[in-house]
Amino acid sequence: MAMNHPLFSQEQPQSWPWGVAMYANFHYHHHYEKEHMFEKPLTPSDVGKLNRLVIPKQHAERYFPLGAGDAADKGLILSFEDEAGAPWRFRYSYWTSSQSYVLTKGWSRYVKEKRLDAGDVVHFERVRGSFGVGDRLFIGCRRRGDAAAAQTPAPPPAVRVAPAAQNAGEQQPWSPMCYSTSGGGSYPTSPANSYAYRRAADHDHGDMHHADESPRDTDSPSFSAGSAPSRRLRLFGVNLDCGPEPEADTTAAATMYGYMHQQSSYAAMSAVPSYWGNS
C-alpha cells in the first residue's frame, strides 16, 4: 500500500522533523521539574494521638481540591514519594466539625518511621502531569534544627591572597614614574622590578670601584687606614683617576642616584657625577 503522506514519502526518511523532535524534548524537560508547593511546621497535635496532619486551608484548596460529590464526603487517597523514592498513601478529607483539611490514614506510620517531633517541618512538592497523566506528589521532612541552616545561605569562600614576591621592596606603592633603562626605550615597570634594578645597579657600581683599584695604590706606603685611597673609575670607555671623596658626600650621591633613577632614566644618567672637566 502506497503512503502518500509527506512524512512517509520516499524522498524523506521515516522520522519526525527536527523541529517536532526538539519541541517534544523541551516539553518533556519543562514538565518534569519539581515544583515546591508548601511546607508545614508540625504542631504537638500533628504528631500526637490524633493521628492526623492538618493542612492549611489556602494550600489545601489550591493543591488538593476535593470538589463536590463523593470526594467531598469520603475524601481521597493521595499517593506520595519520599526522598528515597518509597511510596506513601494518605487519606485526605475535610472535617466539617473542625472545618479543616487533614491527612489521616497512613500518617501515623509516616510519623513513626521518620521519627518526627513537634517543630519538625514537612514539605510537599509536585511534578506537573502532562499527556493526560496526573501530577506526581512528593513528601519530605527536615529536623527542627536544620530549618535555620536551610534558610541561612552559605558564606562565600575565602579568597586567599598570594604573598608578595621576595625582595619586592618595602611595600612601595605603584608609581607611573618608574622606568627601566634597559633596552632602547623607557617603559614603565613595577616598583618591585625598579627596586631590584636599583640594588643591582648599586652592587655593580661598587664592584666597578673595587675592581678598578690599582694594586700600586693599595700597596704604596702612602696608603693607610686613616686616609682614603685614590681610585680609578672607568666611565664610557675612559679611565679616570678620582681623588678621595668624603664618605658623607658618597652616601649623599648614592642616595641621590637611587632617587633620580626611580624618577626617570634621564634623571638617573644626569645624577652620575661628571668627571670630564677634571681629566
Curated annotation (Swiss-Prot):
Places the protein is found:
Nucleus
The UniProt regions of compositional bias labelled Basic and acidic residues, in chain numbering, are 203-219
Write out the entry's keywords from A to Z. Answer: DNA-binding, Nucleus, Transcription, Transcription regulation
UniProt cross-references to InterPro entries, sorted A to Z: B3_DNA-bd (IPR003340), DNA-bd_pseudobarrel_sf (IPR015300), LEC2-like (IPR044800)
Q: Which residues bind DNA?
A: 38-144
Name of this protein: B3 domain-containing protein Os11g0156000
Q: Which organism is it from?
A: Oryza sativa subsp. japonica (Rice)
Could you tell me one molecular function GO term of this UniProt entry? DNA binding
Q: Name one GO cellular component term.
A: nucleus
